[in-house]
UniProtKB/Swiss-Prot annotation:
This is Translationally-controlled tumor protein homolog. InterPro entries: Mss4-like_sf (IPR011057), Mss4/transl-control_tumour (IPR011323), TCTP (IPR034737), Translation_control_tumour_CS (IPR018103), Translational_control_tumour_p (IPR018105). GO terms for cellular component: cytoplasm; food vacuole. Belongs to the TCTP family. Keywords: Calcium, Cytoplasm. It is found in: Cytoplasm. Residues 1-171 form the TCTP domain. SUPFAM superfamilies: Mss4-like. Its main location: cytoplasm. One of its GO terms (molecular function) is calcium ion binding. Pfam families: TCTP. Involved in calcium binding and microtubule stabilization.
Length: 171
């Protein structure tokens, strides 16, 4: 299994167990980002009622049960908020950091990143109110932000990652 980690904080933010797709169904964005679908799962109430054969056992299930989004729960992501102005300042700084990282580690990616990042960020800013933002476990603002949005009538969000801000680690 591959785990995707933030290049600046080592936060684990995704894995290859999620099928990667074109962000926002825009194939050009795939060169710098990827999108994955999340699922809801039930967490808690680990008492499976093995010793309790009564009909009342079903009633006891609700108290400790919580519905969670699998990616948020598995990678301990935390929701964060930005105004459009705050996000603009953050993303400008972050893109410069990623470009510098690429110059040092993957120089062949620098020009692609700089060219493709502009329309991607423009899409985020144009649709800003449709997004929720998440941070990795460290809650470090130097890390990449993970974008979440709901597509159509889906009941769970999709998550979008800037791939040049991540590295893969095999387990």
């Amino acid at each position: 299994m591959k785990v995707f980690k933030d290049v600046f904080t080592n936060d684990e933010v995704c894995s290859d167990s999620y099928v990667q797709q074109d962000p926002f169904e825009v194939p050009e964005f795939r060169e710098i980002a990827f999108e994955v679908k999340s699922n809801k799962r039930i967490k808690g109430n680990e008492d499976y009622g093995i010793a309790d054969n009564s009909e009342d056992a079903v009633e006891g299930m609700g108290a400790d049960v919580e519905h969670v989004i699998d990616i948020v729960d598995s990678f301990q992501l935390t929701s964060t908020a930005f105004s459009k102005k705050e996000y603009s300042a953050y993303i400008k700084n972050y893109m410069q950091k990623v470009a510098k990282y690429l110059e040092e580690k993957k120089p062949d990616r620098v020009e692609i990143f700089k060219t493709k990042a502009q329309p991607f960020i423009k899409h985020i800013l144009t649709n800003f109110d449709d997004f929720e933002f998440y941070m990795g476990e460290s809650l470090d603002m130097e890390a990449g932000i993970i974008y979440s949005y709901y597509k159509g009538e889906e009941i769970t969000p999709r998550f979008v990652y800037i791939s040049d801000g991540l590295f893969e680690e095999k387990y």
